[in-house]
Amino acid sequence: MKTLYFLGGLPRSGSTLLGSLLNQHSEIYVSPTSPLGDVVSGIEKIFNEVDIQFTFDRKEVSYNVYSSVLANFYNHIPKPVILDKHRFWGKNLDTVQMFLSNKPKIVATYRSIPEVLTSYISLIERTQHENNFIDEHLRKDNLPITNNNRAEYIWRYYVAPSYESMIYGITKYPEWVHLVEYNNLVKNPQEELNKVYEFLEIPSHTNTFHNIENACGEQKDEEWGLKGLHDIRPNLSKISQNPIDVIGKENVKIYSKFDL
């Protein structure tokens, strides 16, 4: 039987890098962004709809369906330990813990909010992708394309929901969530990975940090509306702009309030 765990956290905080490194372990499979979380949420929606008309033992049937989906979603993967990647597993722990055969565990990547916002904006400027989803939204709202407006939109619609899910999991189930801070991962990768292995209760592994294969890349990356969103560098390094230079000192002060 496979053991199902989860990979969550904030966008632009190293989840693709961490997943690719964990995939080097012979016992671990880390997925790209997965639909499993949406499938689980969809099951609840369907049960709420059919419960009005149909007569059935909802408690028993719910258990059968949820537990079967969670147990069998990755039957085609030969590795015994699965980490399913989705930003919103934190807020889904209430449901998952009732139907999972093992204790739920989330590995959550984290980075300071100003750095996350800066990473998004730097990627836009670096790729010169004019039709990226952020600027498209600003145009539709007749807002000027400025880094200040970009930062506000990114936070409100893309970072805050993931942040709230992560905070929910940390607050309600602290023993089930392990945080991996981006800068620590880049500076001391093996040390951070060993902590993850210990948290997942699996044997340690000596990782390789050169010619890293992007094992968690998104085949449909263009559907995310920004080229290179899930690219990683083959050799472990940090090349980041100073948030003050990108979003300004005042925005750094505002968004730093949300840092853990």
Model-based region annotation:
Residues M1-N72, H76, A215-E222:
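PAPS-dependent sulfotransferase catalytic core
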